[in-house]
Amino acid sequence: MAIPTSLSLFPASPSSPPKPILAAPVKPSCVTVRFKNGGGLSAGEDLPLDYETWLPKRDVKNRRRAGILLHPTSLPGPFGIGDLGPQAFQFVDWLHDAGCSLWQVLPLVPPGRRADEEGSPYSGQDANCGNTLLISLEELVKMVYCQRKSFQNHSVADIKDPLVAENNIFVISGWLEDAAYFAAIDDTLNTFSWYDWPDPLKNRHLAALEEIYQSKKEFIDIFIAQQFLFQRQWQKVHDYARMKGINIMGDMPIYVGYHSADVWANKKQFLLNGSGFPLLVSGVPPDAFSETGQLWNSPLYDWKAMERDGFSWWVRRMRRAQNLFDDFRIDHFRGFAGFWAVPSEAKVATVGRWKVGPGKSLFDAIFRAVGDINIIAEDLGVITEDVVQLRRSIGAPGMAVLQFGFGSDAENPHLPHNHEQNQVVYTGTHDNDTIRGWWDILPQEEKSNVVKYLGNIVEEDISWELIQAALSSVAKTAIIPMQDVLGLGSSARMNIPATQVKKHAYAYCRPTQVLYLKSARNGNSGMELLRLKLSIHALVNDFI
């Protein structure tokens, strides 16, 4: 019944008589079932014989899925690290056979080359280029052989024109041209950073760039050709994964390295002084990983300048990510709401302070230019209310990590009963120890919490106990590091955050013990495949 408009929240004055409330005329109730063809049935009439088949359709976006975190460098390969060759395709087959539908990789960018970066893909030399170390020589030989055979049956124009057309797509990409010139100058001068280059090159004077082009033309052509080969091989792997029903999730660091084409070619988009040196650098305050915080030393964005430019730099970056991946995780998502800014001369991150990020205006600009994109927000660490609201406003799932769940109380957001459907749950990320390594040094109190929460567990099988917990979560996506599937210890850990130089080597390129690919027909690897397949089918596929 509608509420009469004369109804007031305040009592009528006692001196005035109460006004009568007139009831609205009552209409006869009638329930009508409408059909797609426009017809209908009234209450009490017979329903069609197929009525029991009118089941609600589930939204495909809410489909539960499971995946594996494994960087391509951890695949087996004859040259020290994995690549985009046959083993990458075999891994896709393995994912398909296991019932997985997602493969997460770390950033595919060229890794940092400085000593303090230890080859980290999170301090890459370029935000858009591919890591050419991933180019498979075996696939390259196959491609050359196939092209040579084609020459026997076709004219030169038939072969050359399509290849030139494909290559020109890359040549006209602004980011690739910037990266090629940057690499050519860097190869010529070999300084610590572009800040030390002569002013004409440092400030991109056209005459100086033309001189570099003339003197380093072969280098520039080879650089572009290598990126073309990377793109071609990656696209082949990506297309094969899609054919097998596997989405590939990339990883996008929020910041870029100072010694990069991104900063050199876009100085006005960063907080630099008049000579090009950073005013403020990135980091995070003290947290669970470090008592003094983490000093990342990446230059910070000039968000006001970026907004005036329509966030065009970010739009280009997102378009490139769309070209490479089906989904992608944005590392340190909280920096879009509020970011930690540290003076560039500081030695520790504790002297920084919080500053306001671009917020939803950045994503509004991206969505207008790019359309819908599948973002996963890395929302770990110090997560304030504005970060939560920003993530929800763009519909991006956050993250939960089981290893973080057992050290406090029942309100811990990483415990399974606190998970959300629109979330991605991990046993651990690349920054965590493996489950086996984590368990070996876990304080007894936390071990007791794990046992109480998960029930009767077998400690020798702790990796699989947590894998089962992740797959059982209400979160619609679960991702398991390959090291945990194999039950490996701390020696297989990918990274140790906030560790000082020379105390560790960034192990992202250490080949994992991938026995699952080498001997899938017998031994432990075959059993692990069967076990993962049964777990995923029981806990994911049967309940979508």
Sequence positions of predicted segments:
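Catalytic domains of carbohydrate-active enzymes, especially glycoside hydrolases
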Residues: W54, D59-K61, P86-P111, R320-D327, ...
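Alpha-amylase-like alpha-glycosidases and glucanotransferases acting on alpha-linked glucans and related
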Residues: K57-R64, H71, A115-Q231, Y255-I479, ...
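Surface-exposed amphipathic alpha-helices with a cationic face
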Residues: H96, W234-R242, F367, R391-R392
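Conserved, well-ordered alpha-helix/loop/beta-strand core segments that scaffold catalytic motifs
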Residues: Q227-V256
